Amino acid sequence: MAFRQALQLAACGLAGGSAAVLFSAVAVGKPRAGGDAEPRPAEPPAWAGGARPGPGVWDPNWDRREPLSLINVRKRNVESGEEELASKLDHYKAKATRHIFLIRHSQYHVDGSLEKDRTLTPLGREQAELTGLRLASLGLKFNKIVHSSMTRAIETTDIISRHLPGVCKVSTDLLREGAPIEPDPPVSHWKPEAVQYYEDGARIEAAFRNYIHRADARQEEDSYEIFICHANVIRYIVCRALQFPPEGWLRLSLNNGSITHLVIRPNGRVALRTLGDTGFMPPDKITRS
């Protein structure tokens, strides 16, 4: 009898957990009445993974590349013991530092009826030239340029890449602009439909997981990688990389053509060197839209 009651309790617990996951998934992008000041609890989307660490607690395995997490300890040979474990840990341990340069596209024509019509303005082309010159002046050996497949990002990339000859370019849909997660606090001037958070959020999170992580264990030298994309994507990535609440992304502001520099150490520690730097541009060339 006691065993049957235990099974019933366990079943209730599982059902409750499923309901909680379902609720959190539905809560993303849920329309609300009221103005900017309306309080609400922040609900992480279901695709964001498990429970977050407590405030101020750093998750060392945030990218799921902590060496110990890559080893199946249950398959460890009992006879070889700690020696074999140490060897495997060394095999999976990162050695290099990754430098991630996140570039926001330059100013573009916002009134284009189609995405392909939203090309860079003359000022936007000047901004891209200035950003390219700034990157070239750093004297770094850039490994690659990954860019969004949207027109304004492609045009920004084409101009910047002229200042970085020989650096390969890769286009991806993952970095396209979108609504990553419902912002907190909410704002009245920007309210996408719930389905947009559902579709864009998972894609932008996939971009973060695909591109933002510690170096592969086989990488011997530090790398310098450029990602040319959009304000929402960059702000979300910065919050996720620093393990700040991702729903706070809209509290940050980025100028067109700005440079954000993230550093990912071999031990998984992340540092933000610069956020939205446009100090290399004359004041009359700086815009945010």
Curated annotation (Swiss-Prot):
Residues the UniProt record annotates as site (Cleavage): 24-25
Catalytic activity: O-phospho-L-seryl-[protein] + H2O = L-seryl-[protein] + phosphate; O-phospho-L-threonyl-[protein] + H2O = L-threonyl-[protein] + phosphate
Positions in the Mitochondrial matrix compartment: 1-6
Modified residues (N6-acetyllysine): 116, 144, 191
Record-linked CDD domains: HP_PGM_like
EC number: 3.1.3.16
Residues recorded as bearing Phosphoserine in the entry: 80, 87
Modifications made to the protein after synthesis: Both isoform 1 and isoform 2 are phosphorylated by the RIPK1/RIPK3 complex under necrotic conditions. This phosphorylation increases PGAM5 phosphatase activity.
Disordered: region residues: 32-59
Listed SUPFAM superfamilies: Phosphoglycerate mutase-like (SSF53254)
Alphabetic keyword roster: Acetylation, Hydrolase, Membrane, Mitochondrion, Mitochondrion inner membrane, Mitochondrion outer membrane, Necrosis, Phosphoprotein, Transmembrane, Transmembrane helix
Compartment(s) of residence: Mitochondrion outer membrane; Mitochondrion inner membrane
Membrane topology field: Single-pass membrane protein
GO molecular function: protein serine/threonine phosphatase activity
Bias kind Low complexity: ranges: 45-56
Predominant cellular place of this UniProt entry's protein: mitochondrion
Location of the region described as Interaction with KEAP1 in the Swiss-Prot/TrEMBL record: 77-82
Transmembrane segments: 7-29
Mitochondrial intermembrane side: 30-289
Description of how the protein assembles with itself and partners: Dimer. Forms a ternary complex with NFE2L2 and KEAP1. Interacts with BCL2L1 and MAP3K5. Upon TNF-induced necrosis, forms in complex with RIPK1, RIPK3 and MLKL; the formation of this complex leads to PGAM5 phosphorylation. Isoform 2, but not isoform 1, interacts with DNM1L; this interaction leads to DNM1L dephosphorylation and activation and eventually to mitochondria fragmentation.
Domains as described in the record: The N-terminal 35 amino acids, including the potential transmembrane alpha-helix, function as a non-cleaved mitochondrial targeting sequence that targets the protein to the cytosolic side of the outer mitochondrial membrane.
Entry similarity comment: Belongs to the phosphoglycerate mutase family. BPG-dependent PGAM subfamily.
General function of this protein: Mitochondrial serine/threonine phosphatase that dephosphorylates various substrates and thus plays a role in different biological processes including cellular senescence or mitophagy. Modulates cellular senescence by regulating mitochondrial dynamics. Mechanistically, participates in mitochondrial fission through dephosphorylating DNM1L/DRP1. Additionally, dephosphorylates MFN2 in a stress-sensitive manner and consequently protects it from ubiquitination and degradation to promote mitochondrial network formation.
Protein name as annotated: Serine/threonine-protein phosphatase PGAM5, mitochondrial
Species whose genome carries this gene: Homo sapiens
Gene: PGAM5
